[in-house]
Regions:
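...captures the hydrophobic TM-helix bundle architecture rather than a specific catalytic motif
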Residues: 1-272
């Protein structure tokens, strides 16, 4: 009579084949695949960001001047909310680990509680990223872009603080036409018009003697170079368009690469 013998080797395999690779279970192996792929992906992002920042360090936007907002509060809070988001992300990771540990110890109520905290933390983080994107895209002060793609920002010479376009731009009786299929090239689309035209910014600048231009270049003190009144007027002669906020092509904060990395890294992180 034939008989079937079950060996310990057969019990140690998963999905056919020989013994478990490195003695790991299927779930643990897939978790390591996830961790390593994550590490490689973010390493690539951060290495590219670091290289680009080092390459253009003299004109790279200052993060403390870009991320200054906190929901429901008005004022200048450099990187405060970014630090809060980092704290929420770390704590949600901790609660997830605690939930897994509670599951191993068969503590159902603890698992439910820690998973609830993890979900709340994840919702806060993703919601914060959505708010951060909206604020970044909308912009704060506005700027003008030159023929060479450089960004010129504006400063109040009396106080040294940034000046928004709305603070000095003139209102001119000029007609502004947005490109549409019926009045242009049918396969070319155009975004919404900025609040002010280049001419309105120039005329307003001439009428306010206390407004000067701040360039992208960073001096030895780590601050953006502020031009004199005459130098500002000379620079503005090369202005081609008004930039409000940021996207993948134009960026009022400075280098467009800064905005590109912001969208790709934070976007991948949010979906991840």
């Amino acid at each position: 009579m034939d008989s079937t013998v079950t060996t310990g080797v057969e019990e140690s395999v998963w999905g056919g084949g020989d013994n478990r690779p490195l003695g790991a279970s299927y779930g643990k192996m897939m978790m390591w695949f996830f961790i390593l792929s994550d590490a490689l992906t973010f390493s690539g992002f951060l290495a590219a960001y670091g290289f680009s920042r080092f390459k253009f360090i003299e004109t790279w936007p200052i993060a403390d001047e870009v991320f200054t907002h906190v929901p429901f509060f008005h004022g200048n809070y450099p990187m405060y909310y970014v630090a809060f988001m980092t704290f929420v992300l770390i704590m949600s990771s901790v609660t997830m680990v605690l939930a897994v540990d509670a599951g191993h110890r068969m503590k159902k109520n603890s698992v439910i509680w820690y998973m609830f905290l993890t979900i709340i933390g994840g919702a806060i983080f993703v919601g914060s990223q959505a708010w951060e994107w909206a604020t970044f895209i909308q912009g704060d002060y506005g700027a003008v872009e030159t023929k060479g793609g450089r960004i010129l920002q504006f400063v109040n010479a009396d106080t040294g603080e940034r000046a928004a376009l709305a603070d000095f731009a003139a209102t001119l009786p000029e007609e502004r036409t947005i490109h549409e299929n019926k009045n242009g090239i049918w396969f070319y689309s155009e975004g919404s018009l900025p609040t002010y035209s280049v001419n309105e910014v120039l005329e307003g600048f001439k009428a306010h003697s206390n407004i000067v231009v701040r360039t992208e270049t960073i001096n030895e003190e780590g601050e953006k170079v502020v031009l004199s009144r005459q130098e500002s007027l000379a620079k503005l002669k090369n202005a081609t368009q008004v930039v409000e906020g940021a996207n993948l092509i134009h960026n009022e904060y400075g280098s467009r690469l800064f905005a590109d990395f912001f969208f790709f890294i934070t976007g991948f992180h949010g979906f991840h």
